[in-house]
Curated annotation (Swiss-Prot):
Cofactor note: The heme is bound between the two transmembrane subunits CybS and CybL.
Segments in the Mitochondrial matrix topological domain: 32-69, 141-153
Compartments where found: Mitochondrion inner membrane
UniProt pathway: Carbohydrate metabolism; tricarboxylic acid cycle; fumarate from succinate (eukaryal route): step 1/1
Molecular-function GO term, any one: metal ion binding
Pfam families for the chain: Sdh_cyt
Gene: SDHC
Record NCBIfam families: succ_dehyd_cytB
UniProt protein name: Succinate dehydrogenase [ubiquinone] cytochrome b large subunit, mitochondrial
Family: Belongs to the cytochrome b558 family.
GO BP: mitochondrial electron transport, succinate to ubiquinone; tricarboxylic acid cycle
Amino acid sequence: MSLLPYNATLCRVLRHNVKFIRSVQTSAARVSAEKTPIQVWGWDYLMRQRALKRPIAPHLTIYKPQMTWMVSGLHRVTGCAMAGTLLIGGVGFSVLPLDFTTFVEFIRGLGIPWVILDTFKFIIAFPIAFHTLNGIRFIGFDMAKGTDIPSIYRGAYLVLGLAALISLAVVVYPRWERHKKATLPTNH
């Protein structure tokens, strides 16, 4: 078996790649060590600001917290947290040799006090409820509904309150149902 045809093809492909790379290198703009006037002005401006002990960019701590940007930021954070949790959880449960039910039973078997478990349930339920309700609120914004400042604040407080109530219901209802079943009289 001869490798000559294969070698000839490989050399031809490499020769074309070298030609392409050389053409890109010669046609690309050269990087100059010399700065343009606007770059020089910008650098000098930043150095003057640094000498005056000023921050390069304003920090959030200099602004009065407002409900509008706090709720918007929380919406983004909850969305990213849920996406990350879904990604890590999905990959984790597909790779690991256990399923979600086994994981839940393992957590129950640890004997963690109910206060801690319910706190974690609330921490899990709140972002889901908040992100869902605030997403509905944002759909209203897309339809130009409730975009005046009083309505925005009312809607933000409503979303936060409802999300807290729904999360609390998600945590309390199963415990209430178990308590109700345990206290029902048995008919013998």
